[in-house]
Amino acid sequence: MQRYDYLKAIAADAADIKDALVVSTGWASREWWAVRPSDGNLKTRTLGLVSSIAAGLAIALPQRKVIAIDGDGAFLMNLCGLPTIAKQSPGNFIHLLFDNEIYEASGGTATASRHADAVVLAKGAGYRNATWVKSLEEFRVEFVRAWQHNELTLIAVKVEPGQPKDLPPLKLDEIENKYRFMRYLEATEKKGILNPGFDSKL
């Protein structure tokens, strides 16, 4: 199965997922946007930043669910961030890892993930809840459990490369996305980010 199949499943399983903040990169950003269009989605261009940005959001906004949609290449580029995330252990942070063993967005070069165990790496860094799943049903069970419980969780799954042929393009770049995301936070959290004097009633 492909990553898109799993993303569609979690969007259906979590009734209030529309309120979650979701950080992603690469093709996963387009796929998630097709599943759940929202200004609560943040796309990062640089591999390796997804988990740290998502963890920072989770720490700053403990009342919000935050999801990181990570890939194996990006995950391996930020191993140094795992101990920090585990030390802070934000319970509202769900870390999803889709491992297709390639850098898909940049041409399909193989990653080193087939020679490393992401769950072992996460547990070694201090994640108490980290697991591999082998099917869509297992993935759904683990995701719902993580969604309902307040504990830092990594869910990892091997997926086939590829995307749907009819996947719609993203009609905004990272700059516009960033500002829309911040305005979304200002509106939903009733706090100023760009303007400390922000008035939520305006």
What is each PLM-predicted segment?
Residues 25-28, 100-102, 158-163:
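Glycine-rich beta-alpha junction loops
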Residues 1-47:
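Active-site diphosphate/adenylate-binding microenvironment
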Residues 3-5, 37, 149-202:
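Glycine/aspartate-rich loop-and-adjacent alpha/beta segment that forms the canonical ThDP
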Residues 19-21, 64-68, 93, 149-157:
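Generic beta-sheet signal
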Residues 32-36, 106-110, 166-170:
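Short acidic, glycine/serine/threonine-rich loops at helix termini
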Residues 109-145:
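Conserved thiamine diphosphate
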Residues 30-101:
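Thiamine diphosphate
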Residues 20-25, 42-43, 68, 131-134, ...:
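General beta-strand structural signal in soluble alpha/beta enzymes
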